[in-house]
Amino acid sequence: MDPLASLDFTKSGGLVTAIAVDDATGDVLMVAAMNEQTLRMTLEKGEAVYWSRSRGIWHKGEQSGHTQRVKSVWIDCDGDVVLLRVEQRGGGACHTGKRSCFFRKLEDGRWVDVGEQVFDPAKVYGR
């Protein structure tokens, strides 16, 4: 049986939500989208491949070297969310240079940056 048959790609125009979690710490690193093709590519490569609405197929870390080695794949009860437990390579998952895309915490009614800066995006992306 095809494992992707348990997923519902029809709810969001052919996409499912993908959550990347650090396998060692349990920290949420990022949320992205996947279509059937990129999920198959992820399973074949053993590295996270997402679908970007602006870029199309997006092999995470292909430009920066900050790839995500997939340790295990989980789906939710409705089959429309994929959880990837990953080994984050090269430091950061976020294009801002932070370890995680979730680095702003609401404290006393305002957003506070509590994230760890692990690389300089200007040096990595030339921006």
Question: How would you describe each model-predicted region?
Answer:
Residues 2-15, 21-29, 34-127:
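C-terminal binding/interaction regions
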